[in-house]
C-alpha cells in the first residue's frame, strides 16, 4: 500500500500505542490549544444604539447610548457568558469612549467574574471599564450628530471604494486612516497585555478594520471594504502569539439554549 505523500504522514509507528507521534510540519499545522504565552483579544460589538435607529452619525456628539433593545441584546450575551464561563478570569475590559460601547462593557462586566452582581465567590470584582479612543468608530469630524440626509446635503456623496483616502468630512478620518489607527491600537493593547485575555467593547467598523489589518489574506487592503454585517452584541476573537494574529471566531451571536 502506498502511504500518504511526504509531509502528510503524521504518525510514526502506526498501530503501536506506545509509538511517538510526529506532528505535521509548520506549514500545515493547525493549533487548537491556546499557547501559554498567547494573548487573546475578544472584540464585542455594542448592542443596538439610538444613533443606529435614528439615522444619526454617532460620534461623541451624536451617540446617545443603547436602545432598550440594544441593552437586551447585550444582556443576552452576558447571560450566555455567565452560563458558559468562557470569559471568567479575563484580565482587562476596554471600551471605546462612545456611550454605546461603554454601556455594553458595563453590562458584560459581570460575566468576567461569573456573577450577575459583578463579584466572584472569592470576593473578586469585575474589572473597571478602561476607555480607549483608539477603539472608536471612524472619527466623523464635522459630520458628527448630523442625520445622514443632512450629511449628504452638506458634504455630498462619499465613495471609499474609489478613494479610501478621502476624509468622511472636514476634521474626520478617511477609511485608510481609520484602519491604520485601529491596527495600531490593537497592536498596542496586545503588547501591553501580553499573555492575557483582553475584552474590548467596540464597533462594527473597528471589527472590520481588525480583519483587514490582521488577516493575511487581507494584507495590504486597508483601502478595501469587506461588505460584512457584524451583528449587534456579537463576539470576534483573536489570538496573538509571537506577533502572529489568528482569528478564532467572527460574529459569534450564539445564545444559551432555553431551559425547558
Regions inferred by a protein language model and the residue ranges of each:
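Active-site catalytic microenvironments for nucleophilic, acid-base chemistry
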Residues: 80, 107-111, 188, 192, ...
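Active-site metal-binding loops of divalent metal-dependent hydrolases
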Residues: 47, 204, 251-253
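Generic beta-sheet signal
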Residues: 41, 91, 189, 196-205
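Short beta-strand scaffold positions
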Residues: 95-96, 180, 201-202
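Active-site-proximal alpha-helix that buttresses catalytic centers in soluble enzyme cores
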Residues: 2-28, 35-39, 45-122
Amino acid at each position: 500500500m502506498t502511504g500518504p505523500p511526504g509531509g502528510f504522514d503524521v504518525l510514526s509507528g502506526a498501530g503501536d500505542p506506545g509509538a511517538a507521534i510526529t506532528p505535521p510540519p509548520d506549514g500545515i499545522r493547525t493549533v487548537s490549544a491556546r499557547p501559554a504565552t498567547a494573548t487573546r483579544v475578544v472584540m464585542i460589538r455594542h448592542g443596538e444604539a439610538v444613533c443606529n435607529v435614528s439615522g444619526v452619525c454617532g460620534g461623541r456628539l451624536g451617540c446617545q447610548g443603547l436602545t432598550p433593545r440594544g441593552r437586551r441584546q447585550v444582556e443576552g450575551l452576558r447571560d450566555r457568558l455567565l452560563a458558559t464561563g468562557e470569559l471568567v478570569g479575563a484580565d482587562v475590559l476596554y471600551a471605546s469612549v462612545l456611550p454605546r460601547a461603554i454601556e455594553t462593557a458595563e453590562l458584560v462586566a459581570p460575566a468576567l467574574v461569573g456573577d450577575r452582581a459583578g463579584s466572584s465567590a472569592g470576593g473578586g470584582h469585575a474589572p473597571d471599564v478602561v476607555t480607549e479612543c483608539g477603539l472608536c468608530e471612524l472619527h466623523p469630524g464635522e459630520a458628527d450628530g448630523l442625520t445622514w440626509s443632512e450629511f449628504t446635503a452638506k458634504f455630498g456623496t462619499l465613495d471609499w471604494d474609489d478613494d479610501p483616502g478621502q476624509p468622511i468630512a472636514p476634521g474626520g478620518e478617511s477609511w485608510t486612516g481609520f484602519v491604520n489607527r485601529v491596527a495600531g491600537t490593537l497592536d498596542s493593547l496586545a503588547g501591553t497585555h501580553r499573555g492575557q485575555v483582553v475584552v474590548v467593547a467596540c464597533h462594527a467598523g473597528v471589527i472590520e478594520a481588525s480583519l483587514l489589518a490582521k488577516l493575511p489574506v487581507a494584507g495590504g487592503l486597508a483601502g478595501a471594504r469587506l461588505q460584512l454585517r457584524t451583528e449587534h452584541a456579537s463576539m470576534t476573537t483573536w489570538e496573538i502569539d509571537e506577533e502572529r494574529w489568528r482569528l478564532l471566531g467572527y460574529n459569534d451571536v450564539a445564545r444559551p439554549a432555553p431551559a425547558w
